[in-house]
Amino acid sequence: MNETNDNDIDQLIYLFSKLPGLGIRSARRIALYLLQDKDVRLKSLINNLVEIDKKIVKCEICGNMDTENICRICSSEYRDKSIIAIVETVAELWAMERSGNFKGLYHVFGHNLSAASRQNPSILRLPELLTRCFAENIKEVIIATNSTLEGQTTAYFITEYLKEHPAKISRLASGIPIGGELDYLDDGTVSAAINLRQPFE
């Protein structure tokens, strides 16, 4: 095998190793699995990724990922449209959906605030959130940011920003450890946190 091919395979392994939860050893196994039957496995993966890239878009309302400009959650007539949960990323939205215990709407920030990195609060899409709260007559805002320092910082900033809106503001409750991230918790823990949410002050 020539040097160019070696470099190409190394690049493939490197790309896989950058995926969440994968290290170099796992990346090597995946690359080898695909390359051993590339006409079926690798081409199938490539074709599916191309199709996903064409079809998946960000919801214009909440920031969720879907195949429609307005996602299935926002367009559903069965959701409680008086409650909105604020999450950092789509991963946290999926975690709450898996719990089967939240029937409201979502607002995905896509980021959190870090005092250390001095991020601009404009990354949080707060004006859009406030507009939604007034336009959709939201009665309760659940702050479902992670229990990390950044998540807590973001939660306090949201609370201050929403002071002009009369909605009740609550925070996910017991079951989420300090420093814990929502996406890594089991479904029962997420469900308990939703049920036992508390006013956020």
Swiss-Prot record:
Cross-referenced SMART domains: TOPRIM (SM00493)
Listed Pfam families: RecR_C, RecR_HhH, RecR_ZnF, Toprim_4
Keywords noted in UniProt: DNA damage, DNA recombination, DNA repair, Metal-binding, Zinc, Zinc-finger
UniProt record, GO biological process: DNA recombination; DNA repair
C4-type ZnF: 59-74
GO molecular function: DNA binding; zinc ion binding
InterPro entries: DNA_Rcmb_RecR, Rcmb_RecR, Rcmb_RecR_Znf, TOPRIM_dom, TOPRIM_RecR
UniProt superkingdom: Bacteria
Residue intervals of the Toprim domain: 82-177
Function as written in the Swiss-Prot or TrEMBL entry: May play a role in DNA repair. It seems to be involved in an RecBC-independent recombinational process of DNA repair. It may act with RecF and RecO.
Family, similarity comment: Belongs to the RecR family.
Stated name of the protein: Recombination protein RecR
Native species: Rickettsia peacockii (strain Rustic)
Phylogenetic placement of the source organism: Bacteria, Pseudomonadati, Pseudomonadota, Alphaproteobacteria, Rickettsiales
